Amino acid sequence: MRGCLQSVKWLTSAVRQSQSLTSSTRFPRRLFNTSTLHYAQGRKPVSELEQRIAAIPIERFRNFCIVAHVDHGKSTLSDRLLELTGTIEAGANKQVLDKLDVERERGITVKAQTCSMLYNHQGEDYLLHLVDTPGHVDFRAEVSRSYASCGGALLLVDASQGIQAQTVANFYLAFAEGLKLVPVINKVDLPSADPERALDQMKNTFELDPKSAVLVSAKTGLNVEQLLPTVIEQVPAPVGDHTKPLRMLLVDSWYSTYKGVILLVRIFDGEVRAGDQVVSFATGLKYFVGEVGIMYPGQTAQSVLRAGQVGYIYFNPAMKRSQEAKVGDTYTKVGSEKLVQPLPGFEEPKAMVFVAAYPVDASDFPHLEDSINQLTLNDRSVTLQKESSEALGAGFRLGFLGTLHCSVFEDRLRQEHGASIIITPPTVPFKVIWKDGKEEIVTNPALFPEEETLRAKVAELQEPFVLATLTFPEEYLGRVIELCESNRGEQKNLEFFTSTQVILKYELPLAQLVDDFFGKLKGSTKGYASLDYEESGWRRSNISKLQLLVNKVPVDAVSRVVHASQVQRLGRLWVSKFKEHVDRQMFEIVIQAAVGRNVVARESIKPFRKDVLQKLHASDITRRKKLLEKQKEGRKRLKAVGNVVIEHKAFQAFLAK
């Protein structure tokens, strides 16, 4: 008993000693708060990079982009500039800013990517912000958003190809934004290079002074070191005041599994730090900032983003819903809403090409939905609507800016999410003007009015037209005019901007343009033509819905609104192609292409034949006729009640190009 009491006394004294030690020794208390990161606000710049950036005033900021036609060397030039400023190590062509698999495979830029650079010019540090923009017409929304965060642009032209259609289009976009343009002639090291011709084209087409142009080779690095001093001297510094309330523009967004939605922002006024609470003008939702930083070239955390800078932020707790990140939205700090005027934002791009997407396996629909939602977060110009088909099940109707945009989205869906999908051929919207004066835009061919409704209730049908600008060598002029005329085009203008190069303008139906017009144009000109287009309004048109019928039952997944001149050709093509992919049945299958009740093409698949005469004697004619009649009646009954089973792979093969 005595031993037990001694043990208790020893334990009691030990506890008292530990309590006195705890009270006398003050350990720092670590506060965990999921909403705010208070410690980040008071953090001083520690890295050499942060110290250098903190010492640079807004007068020594430069935000610029590179404007060019597809494949004129934008991404390669970006690499050389990043190497020159020490942002990345010198080496082979890395295409640092082309981060998507599809960009590296196709050699094109799809997403506008950004990077900050530090450059010492005449003993002073400058903070340069470079945007690598897409060149293709389909990604014009990306281009126009990029221009909003820039003060100037390098207008890049290939010395061997000269000015192309998208050079012209992107020049006018940049000019409309008021950007200061620096002419640059690239690929001067090629044997086929003709810099003098390219300079003359710039002078005649854009009225730019050839003396201000810089002749470079992005591949070899020739004269690239002259570009950044030219940018510093000619491109104006961004305007902003870091002492004013925060005014922050959302330029782009992408999704991270761990951080939620990450925003690319341009700071116009004020500054933002981790721990600040900001509010969206578009949604009214409030968020605590988890981290701010710059792209250098990857995400590099910073203490603060100041007026004039472009960088990224993400929130803590994270922004989980991609729909909350509205591109063109303005953010400010909570409490400053009445002091800040929201920025005008961006014009929403209109989808002009529509496809339907279905999973090959119906059970994959939730996975497909999740995959599409993640991709649309990074690409705001895609419109999304659920739809259902009797033949293919549940799916989505997707709207795109153009055919390349559609093709790239499909590639990204397959590569980045492994989704096995069926994509229908691209279609365009049509306008229905009813007799009561109402107007309706129809994007789904299945919802296009039937022939009886058209005659009774519809006053007029219209289809969209575009003004296409085509540039190509003069020797192919006859072939290109013939191609445009066969696609219902109307010539608007023809000019020679050099002795060998032609600019041809045609008004074309958008439906013809999405039907592989660019591929046919490349074929007619041996790949030397370039194409750009802009909307040209709606026109009255003789259009109708072409349907595919199997045993007189319409297949809803295969219907298309076409011009009267295309009905016969497309109808015959459909029935012959669909016949190849449908398996024989025990009864005859009739495949028809029809406009309303008018059948324009027909094919039939003969049934399997059982030899009912096998056991008969050759001379038993009466019995022979009786068995054949019986077999014929049986087939009629089977055809009347039997359903044609068409597998998904048949649709997949039929809808593939």
UniProtKB/Swiss-Prot annotation:
- Per UniProt, what is the membrane topology? Peripheral membrane protein
Q: Where is the transit peptide?
A: 1-39
Which GO-annotated molecular functions does the record name? GTP binding; GTPase activity; mitochondrial ribosome binding
Keywords, alphabetical: GTP-binding, Hydrolase, Membrane, Mitochondrion, Mitochondrion inner membrane, Nucleotide-binding, Protein biosynthesis, Transit peptide
Cellular component, GO, one term = mitochondrial matrix
What is this enzyme's EC?
Answer: 3.6.5.-
Protein family per UniProt: Belongs to the TRAFAC class translation factor GTPase superfamily. Classic translation factor GTPase family. LepA subfamily.
HAMAP family, per this entry?
LepA
Q: What is this protein called?
A: Translation factor GUF1, mitochondrial
Species source reads Blastomyces gilchristii (strain SLH14081) (Blastomyces dermatitidis)
Q: Which gene encodes it?
A: GUF1
